[in-house]
Amino acid sequence: MKKFLLTTLAALVSAALSAQVYTEASDLTLIGKIIDTPNPYHRVDTVKYKGFTKAENLQVRCPAGIAVLFRTDSPSITVKATGDFSYQANNTMRLASHGFDLYIRKDGEWLWAAACCPAPRNPQAPMDLIKNMAPGVKECLLYLPIYSELTSVKIGVEEGRMLQPMESPFRHRVAIFGSSYTHGISTSRAGMSYPDQFTRHTGIQLLSLGCSGNCKMQPYFAAVLEDVDADAFVFDAFSNPNAKMIEQRLFPFIERLQATHPGKPLIFQQTIRRERRNFDTAVEATEAAKQHMADSLMKIAVKRYKDVYYIKPSTSTPLQESSVDGTHPDDYGYYQWSRSIEKPLLRILRKYGLR
């Protein structure tokens, strides 16, 4: 009897899933893409752009910061995806690295709705994202995984229900190149990086090229940024390189981008304070040196170069307890970062007619 019930239940579940009608996400509206790529879920075309390390090559093929906009009246939404879901890290939840993160617009605000993650043993199986929604058309924003290379993402709605591309409500194209912080490492969900939170709260579209451990103002990343169609550029450029590297690379990096993007604002962020500095004297010395170097050189840069700016984010709480691992903030820390740069960044963008 028990076996019969389980078999019947499995058949019912299968029938329910088969009743879903699927649409490839790239046939809807993608936002957050920094540059066009043959695979719509890649951030950089690694056939065209060369020089990346093996780790960087994977990172730029992961869709961190890319999201899908669509409208549907379906009471339920499912997701099917194919790709490489092998990344593992102790400091980042699978819902962020492998998962899909849904927001729905309500009363003009993007409100969190649901998240799902591929099953480790059967990652290509359909995932129930959300069910039992009230009648009516929903405007949806679905973030893609931050650390999984995707070959296909299909969004499923109930048969007979509407699924349409949604015109993007996000304004402008502001590129952001950064470290694991910009990538979203240690977030709990795929849409919780500080660029994603900034975009939802301000309506200004940030195009993320966050690469964990690998934002060091490398010439081959500059080559990508030279080809990016953006209204402004933001950098989290002082988190990964040491003081000597900052000294050697900062001014050539600025000059190269100004040559290809004259008149566009280049906005550099100081790196945040890592809680590992609290008692580790070696980390304290290294971090203090690179922050001092960044402060010293940016003081010169903002005077030497037109359209170059310097802002300082913060993730601090009174007892510095927003850290996951001594390096990366948690979701609340990234929220603090997003809010701390909001006023200075918007003030700079307004100077260039970006409102």
Residue ranges and their predicted role:
Residues V324-R355:
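Histidine-centered active-site loop/cap adjacent to the catalytic His
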Residues R71, N132-A134, E139-C215, P219-D229:
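Serine-esterase "nucleophile elbow" of acetyl-processing enzymes
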Residues H261-P265:
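A short helix->loop->beta-strand "cap" motif at the edges of active sites that frequently abuts
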Residues R274-K312, R355:
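Substrate-gating cap/lid alpha-helix
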Residues C215-F251, R256, T271-N278:
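Oxyanion-hole/transition-state-stabilizing segment in secreted/luminal serine hydrolases
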Residues T8, V13, S18-R173, L349-R355:
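N-terminal secretory targeting modules
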Residues M1-F4:
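Positively charged n-region of N-terminal signal peptides that target proteins for export
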